[in-house]
Structures are given as C-alpha cells and as structure tokens.
Amino acid sequence: MSLRIVFLGSPTFAVLPLERLVADSRYQVVGVVTQPDRPAGRGKMPVATPVKQAALRLGLPVLTPETLRDPAAVADLADLRPDVGVVAAYGEILRRDVLAIPPLGYVNIHPSLLPLYRGPSPVAGAILNGDAETGVTIMVIEAKMDAGPILAQRVVPLPPDARTGSLTRELFAIGADMLLETLDAYATGAITPHPQDHARATFTKLLSREDGIIDWSQPALRIERMTRAYDPWPGATTTWRGAPLKIIAARVRSDRHSDAPPGTLLDTAEGLAVATGDGLLVLETVQPAGKRPLPAADWRRGVRLTGGERLGG
C-alpha cells in the first residue's frame, strides 16, 4: 500500500522533489500545499508558484491558503488524511496543530549540514563564509525552526565560484534523490531519527534588500562572496553617479592595494577595479539600473569615467 503524502513547497527548486515522489510507486501524493498566486511582472497579474503549476500539470489537488494559521486551511489539510508530509521550501513555519496531522509528521529537505545554517538562507550563508563544503539534510520537522532530528545527510563540496541560485538547485536535486529512499526507510522503521547537536547550531536570517548593499570599506574577498551569495536575491548592489549598479561578477586581487579611498574606480592592467578596505576587486560583469548585465569593460567604455570617481558615494 502506497504511503499517503502531502507535499508542501513553492519555488522552482521544489518542483523536482514533487515530480520524483509522484513517479515513485511507493508513494501517493494526495495533495499539494503551496503559497497563493502573487502579482508579478509589469502587469502585476497573479502568477502561480512553480509548485502549483507542476501540481496542476500532474493532476494533483492543490491548496493555496494565505496562511496555515487559518483553521479552515488546517481542516482542509487534515481532510487529505496524509501519512506523512514532505516540505521543500514551503515559505511558512508550521505550527503544532499542523504538525500533528500526519501520523509520521513532516520530513524536510534542508540545504545545509544541520545544525549549521538553520533558517531561511543557508546556501547564502555558506557561500558568504567561504565554506569548503555544504550539504543536504533530511530531517523531521519540530515546532522549533530546523531543530528536529536528522534522518540522513550528504556532504557536497562547495566550489569557489558557487552562486546561491545554481547551488540551491543542485542541493535540492540531491535532496530529491535522498528523500525517496529516506522516506521509505523512515516509514518502515528501518532508520531512526537522531537528535541534532544543538550546541553547534548556527543561524541565518531572511535576506533583505539592505543586505546586498556593498560597503566598500570591507575586504575585497568579502565583497566578491556577496556577488555570489546574494545571487539572485538581493544582489550585490552599489550606486554610481546616484543610480543603482549591481555587481554581478568580480575577482579578488588581495595582493594589490591602492591608497585611493574605498569605492574608487581604478583602471588597471587587469581591467576596471575598485579600491576596497583590503585588496582590489576587479569587476567582470555589472548591471546598470534598467539594463541587462554586460561586461565591465563594455560598461567602462560606454560611461566615460573621469579620474577619481567612486562607487557608493
């Protein structure tokens, strides 16, 4: 008899785990819970989440409550009679009344090696800190965020050029593979959840636009990591002549220094660079406001820089 699953997820990278569950005869996805349609694009027309679009394509029942704090939404979820819930970036912390619905609780795909990087921005956190490795954790959800016992983990090398968007997709693809075997083993009692070492826990926060604003007095290494950690959101941003400028890609020259104030644009043999608090940051790709990304050299030729101009000033 197939295990009855309710799937909770919203963004693009949560679609693959859903598709893999539907394709596996051991599991029966009895319903999908995702965020409501939100206005998007220039016309601000309501747009369904990628998970909702996938669920409709797969012929699955879909619930889109504004919040699972709504008693009616909780009742609708209970009516699905799931044995277990699977969560992949749903977008809301589950309360105890929701957690109590499936007899086996909820299993979550978390893109870090818990207890490290609990919270909403684990991939960005690992990149920003320059970690050599990251990973995926399959865990049982408890009321406290990302603190539940662990079912499985896999270590994944963190390349020095990793960006949050692409790495998140990779980690959730790995998580989808892990989920299929872990879920069956958990349901049959073949594996036992083991508690996290809470003393080792580290935490991340929901990123805001302000997090992406570059402080040029920081080291070049830190700023370069920002360009990758904050891709696609919120981006590593500064201003030039009063207008926003996003730094898409750059490289660090920690062996090169300048007496110019942080943020000063410098022509170097390696290209357009910026003075920082420690080392030079050579710009590779930038995006002016309202325009597409372009090579920094092309931007440099088009804007007619004058000597001593500064970013962020």
Swiss-Prot record:
Single GO molecular function: methionyl-tRNA formyltransferase activity
Pfam assignment, any one: Formyl_trans_N
Reactions catalysed: L-methionyl-tRNA(fMet) + (6R)-10-formyltetrahydrofolate = N-formyl-L-methionyl-tRNA(fMet) + (6S)-5,6,7,8-tetrahydrofolate + H(+)
Protein family according to the UniProt entry: Belongs to the Fmt family.
NCBIfam families in the cross-refs: fmt
Function as written in the Swiss-Prot or TrEMBL entry: Attaches a formyl group to the free amino group of methionyl-tRNA(fMet). The formyl group appears to play a dual role in the initiator identity of N-formylmethionyl-tRNA by promoting its recognition by IF2 and preventing the misappropriation of this tRNA by the elongation apparatus.
Name used for this protein in its record: Methionyl-tRNA formyltransferase
Organism: Roseiflexus castenholzii (strain DSM 13941 / HLO8)
